């Protein structure tokens, strides 16, 4: 009975509060969803949110309002880590691009630069056929 296993206190580690004053907001806006990731200048993720993760399902994920809520949620978490200024890089053709940028400004983050990093093919893959509704 002497070599019984020692009971250890293994509690999940609490996320440390980083002091980062500037960062980059990556907004990926597709036709189906909007994903907002806020990183430090080196690209390490600090917070993220998406329309689907906030409870929007189906076609509601692709609305500007869902993108606004996702950007707000990610920005509030980033501001808890001390973020004040932000550069925005937007990718994709979705409806939530402008709404996400506006809500980042409305929450209180100062937007220094907005750049569009949507990939444009040099005539690569064949695009999907036109929809007939």
Curated annotation (Swiss-Prot):
Q: Please provide an example of a Pfam family that matches this protein in its UniProt record.
A: Ribosomal_S11
Q: Which GO terms describe its cellular component?
A: ribonucleoprotein complex; ribosome
User: Sorted alphabetically, which InterPro entries does this protein's record hold?
Assistant: Ribosomal_uS11, Ribosomal_uS11_bac-type, Ribosomal_uS11_CS, Ribosomal_uS11_sf
Q: Which UniProt keywords apply?
A: Ribonucleoprotein, Ribosomal protein, RNA-binding, rRNA-binding
Q: GO molecular function, one example?
A: rRNA binding
- Superkingdom of the source? Bacteria
Q: List the residue ranges forming a coiled coil, or say none.
A: none
Query: What does the record list as GO biological process?
Result: translation
The residues that cross the membrane are none
Family, similarity comment? Belongs to the universal ribosomal protein uS11 family.
What is the purpose of this protein?
Located on the platform of the 30S subunit, it bridges several disparate RNA helices of the 16S rRNA. Forms part of the Shine-Dalgarno cleft in the 70S ribosome.
The record's listing under NCBIfam families reads: PRK05309.1, uS11_bact
Task: List the HAMAP family.
Answer: Ribosomal_uS11 (MF_01310)
**Quaternary structure and partners:** Part of the 30S ribosomal subunit. Interacts with proteins S7 and S18. Binds to IF-3.
Q: What is this protein called?
A: Small ribosomal subunit protein uS11
- Origin organism is Shouchella clausii (strain KSM-K16) (Alkalihalobacillus clausii)
Q: Which gene encodes it?
A: rpsK
